[in-house]
Design a protein with these regions (language model features):
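Carboxylate- and glycine-rich phosphate/diphosphate-binding segment that chelates Mg2+/Mn2+
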Residues: 270, 608-720
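Gly/Pro-rich interdomain helix-loop hinge
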Residues: 738, 742-825, 868
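N-terminal Rossmann-like NAD(P)+-binding subdomain of aldehyde/semialdehyde dehydrogenases
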Residues: 1-102, 270
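Glycine/threonine-rich beta-strand-loop-alpha-helix active-site module
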Residues: 153, 526-640
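ALDH superfamily catalytic-core signature
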Residues: 7-9, 125, 201-329
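ATP/NTP phosphate-donor binding region
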Residues: 454-542, 816-817
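Rossmann-like NAD(P) dinucleotide-binding subdomain of oxidoreductase/dehydrogenase enzymes
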Residues: 92-231
């Protein structure tokens, strides 16, 4: 190794920092194999030196027990090595190609390690080993009273590491520690690994550099009346006498149930502890704390030595001095951290009293560190829960000696082994766990673009063809064995016999039924609740919705209220960005009743969609619900139910189906599964809507084609979703009472031009949507209709012209103004409509993400016709 220069000044520390930085730069290029070889060699060397290092520490500091320090050194070498020997800390440490995620470990750089006088060699071993495992350089600032042993431990690790291939200057230390050099080191390092008292920890956190610091412990041990007294007392003795109580997690007080207090005292005495009488307790009080601070002369000393200092005579082999005290506030010297075999003993009148005492002891002197409970873990689980809920400590140990238990991997093998125990924000720390290698690594996450898992959801059964309704209903008896059917429809359909084909078939099969026919357009919550009263009394095992969108929406809501009367519509109507990641989980449907939808108009597609809209009649608020639990279990598309639809309904619902298809095709969430349905529906609507509108029941073929087109469009948008045509249409209809099909048809032209912009203000956000291509998608629709055109823009305009021709042919007017909406009324609602349209659930899947001002502009163009 190169000639060593004593670090005793700012100048020499500056040089050392530079050398360690250069060494770390080289070390950061090492492979995992090289690092693991160095890590093992260093751990072996530290383990082999455990006895001489322990002797040196006790000799130098005059504190602790050699044999226990041997165990600590052994632990720091063996347990730390065992914990991390197979951990990846170099380069790629995790990779999942299916999710496109790769995690890469990088060292943080230079670690400033502040070492306490209480555990000098073991802490130095621990910190140098985890620094080597993570390819960091480390510079140690030892405590002045333990510098010789601390440096020897670091030197032992360094020599073994270099021999195994590590850079020569990867570990260094301050030979002549001072406050000035320690502060300089902390300010110059990349991270501070601090172990010590509150003052040192505060200094570390004030350095301006990231710090991993711990602080004082004041561990209370509560002994519940259900505890195994022999186990509890001997565990506490084992912990408190370990290295003469210098582990920061060691018990500082015991709080004992009054029901077993004498028994616990007897066990302590039996095992060699000394219960101080009141006079002796007072003498020891004055020895523990001097001038408001812990007396350094008692730290790590034997109980007999401390008793002598206090002028108390005890047997030489006394293990612990126990003072019976009552106060838990700071005026009581025994209530402080003592770092010696001196213990406070409190009597508790109840478990809650014990909790309060323990809480106060932690609050005043050991926030965040460790607390301990002895209890019957089988019968007193509630007490354990109360204890960990009350204690503000990051380690809550149960039936465990806290010194050995707190450092981890000895009494619980999932608690990380460490000699630096985080105290969380309660203790003013940045970590709340046992510090380990992960805290000395920067983890880069490489995230490759991945596309969402998509889906195609539809009712489990969809039946179609004219006259299929009674045939499909036979399944209720022959397949499902249903007994009671509740029918939901509107007054017009009921009075005009639309439900008769269903009720006749149910009567034929001997199935009991009841009909609710008070559904109005834009169904209300009151309407749904009225229906649910009947449903609750009737208790159906099947619900059949017959009608257009309103009847099916109302029936879906009744279905929800019947199966889950506890639901909150505000929660169910909550907006989502991804239906699979929504905050609100929709309740499971279909457990009480099977749901069948029978459409009587060709437009909404509700028979195959997971959507419903309900209005709160008291506020006028519409609640749009969307969840695949609302998907009907069966859809029966029988064109015979649509033959006599009036022209206005045929027109509005037909254009609604067209908009469903177009929006589903250009949606960011469109897939090959929805594209085919959308295109087929578009072609069918252009061909057959005029015939259905003009000929009605005289052209049953056109009626059937439109029925199928509406359902295909429904399947398409049930999976690809919609866009701002529907966002704007919903609000226009709500504010100005126009039919839904009319409103979406009115805004369609301007929305298409808006979406087709190749340089949008903002494009939509979805991984499958790689770049703005709505124009291309509109052109593909035009191509499917053989509209011609040489460019995509030309094809778009031809498609819009074709749509306008269709709308005119089926009786549509051209502008909002043409429908009798006054300019004053329209403009007075414009801002509110625009904002609410922006917040509509349909906006999220639109290929162009709109600004509210852009929605407003589209509304204005649609009102006046063209440019504004």
């Amino acid at each position: 190794m190169s000639e060593y220069e004593c670090v005793d000044s700012v100048e020499t520390l500056t040089k050392t920092l530079e050398r360690v930085k250069n060494a770390q730069k080289e070390f950061s290029k090492y492979s995992q194999e090289q690092v693991d070889k160095i890590f093992q060699a260093a751990a072996i060397a530290a383990n082999e030196a455990r006895i001489p290092l322990a002797k040196m520490a006790v000799e130098e500091t005059g504190m602790g027990i050699v044999e226990d320090k041997v165990i600590k050194n052994h632990y720091a070498a063996e347990y730390i090595y065992n914990k991390y020997k197979n951990e990846k800390t170099c380069g790629v440490i995790y990779q999942d190609d299916s999710y496109g995620i790769k995690k890469i470990a990088e060292p943080v750089g230079i670690v400033a390690a502040v070492i306490p006088t209480t555990n000098p060699t073991s802490t130095a071993i621990f910190k140098t080993l985890i620094a080597l495992k993570t390819r960091n350089g480390i510079i140690i600032s030892p405590h002045p009273r333990a510098k010789k042993s601390t440096i020897e431990a670091a030197k032992t690790v360094l020599e073994a590491a270099v021999k195994a291939g590590a850079p020569e200057d990867i570990i260094a230390w301050i030979d002549v520690p001072s406050l000035e050099l320690t502060n300089m080191l902390m300010q110059s390092a990349d991270i501070i690994l601090a172990t010590g008292g509150p003052g040192m920890v505060k200094s570390a956190y004030s350095s301006g550099k990231p710090a991993l610091g711990v602080g004082a412990g004041n561990t209370p041990a509560v002994i519940d009346e259900s505890a195994n007294v022999i186990l509890a007392v001997n565990s506490i003795i084992h912990s408190k006498t370990f290295d003469n109580g210098m582990i920061c997690a060691s018990e500082q007080s015991v709080i004992v149930s009054d029901k077993i207090y004498d028994k616990v005292k007897d066990e302590f005495v039996k095992r060699g502890c000394y219960i101080l009488n009141p006079e002796e307790t007072e003498k020891v009080r004055k020895t523990i704390i001097i001038n408001g601070a812990l007396n350094a002369k008692i730290v790590g000393q034997k109980a007999h030595t401390i008793a002598e200092l206090a002028g108390v005579s005890v047997p030489e082999n006394t293990k612990i001095l126990i003072g019976e005290v009552e106060s838990v506030d700071l005026s009581e010297e025994f209530a402080h951290e003592k770092l010696s075999p001196v213990l406070a003993m409190y009597k508790s009148s109840s478990f809650d009293d014990a909790l309060e005492k323990a809480y106060r002891l932690i609050e005043d002197g050991g926030l965040g560190h460790t607390s301990s409970l002895y209890v019957n873990t089988v019968t007193e689980k509630e007490k354990i829960e109360k204890f960990y809920s009350k204690m503000k400590t990051c380690r809550v140990l149960v039936n465990t000696p806290s010194s050995q238990g707190g450092i981890g991997d000895l009494y619980n093998f999932k608690l990380t082994p460490s000699l630096t125990l985080g105290c969380g924000t309660w203790g003013g720390n940045s970590v709340s766990e046992n510090v380990g290698i992960k805290h000395l690594l920067n983890i880069k996450t490489v995230a490759e673009r991945r596309e969402n898992m998509l889906w195609f959801r539809a009712p489990e059964k969809v039946y179609m063809k004219r006259g299929c309704l009674p045939v499909a209903l036979e399944e209720l008896k022959n397949v499902m064995n249903k007994k009671r059917v509740f029918i939901v429809t509107d007054t017009f359909l009921y009075e005009n016999g639309y439900t008769k084909v269903v009720t006749d078939k149910l009567d034929e099969m001997g199935i009991v039924h009841e009909t609710f026919f008070n559904v109005a357009p834009d169904p209300t919550l009151a309407c749904a609740k009225e229906g649910v009263k009947l449903i609750d009394a009737f208790k159906p095992d099947c619900i059949i919705a017959i009608g257009g969108g309103s009847a099916m929406d109302a029936a879906k809501i009744m279905w929800v209220l019947y199966e889950h009367p506890e639901v909150d519509f505000l929660d169910m109507a909550m907006r989502f960005m991804d239906i699979r990641k929504r905050v609100y989980t929709f309740p499971k449907m279909g457990e009480k009743a099977y749901f069948i939808a029978v459409p009587t108009s060709a437009g909404t597609g509700s028979e195959v969609t997971p959507f419903a809209v309900i209005t709160d009649e008291t506020t006028g608020q519409k609640y749009p619900l969307a969840d695949y639990e609302l998907l009907p279990k069966m859809a029966i598309v029988d064109a015979d139910m649509m033959m006599n639809a009036p022209k206005g309904l045929t027109s509005a619902s037909g254009i609604d189906a067209l908009v469903h298809s177009i929006e589903a095709y250009v949606s960011m969430m469109a897939t090959e599964f929805t594209d085919g349905l959308a295109i087929e529906a578009i072609k069918t609507i252009f061909e057959y809507l005029p015939r259905a509108y003009e000929e009605g029941a005289n052209d049953p073929h056109a009626r059937e084609k439109m029925a199928n087109a509406a359902t295909m469009a429904g399947m398409a948008f049930a999976n690809a979703f919609l866009g701002i045509c529907h966002s704007m249409g919903h609000k226009l209809g709500a504010y100005h009472h126009l039919a839904h099909g009319v409103t979406v048809g009115l805004v369609l032209d301007e929305v298409m031009r808006f979406n087709a912009e190749e340089v949008p203000t903002k494009m939509g956000t979805f991984p499958q949507y790689e770049y703005p291509h709505a124009l291309r998608r509109y052109a593909e629709i035009a191509d499917s209709l053989n509209l011609g055109g040489n460019t995509d823009q030309e094809k778009l305009e031809r498609l819009i012209n074709k749509i306008d021709e269709l709308k005119e042919r089926v009786g549509f007017k051209k502008t909002i103004k043409d429908y009798g909406i006054s300019e004053e009324d329209f403009l007075s609602t414009l801002d509110e409509m625009s904002e609410k349209a922006f917040d509509d659930q349909c906006t999220g899947a639109n290929p162009r993400y709109p600004l509210i001002s852009e929605i407003k502009e589209i509304y204005l163009k649609t009102y006046y016709g063209g440019e504004i």
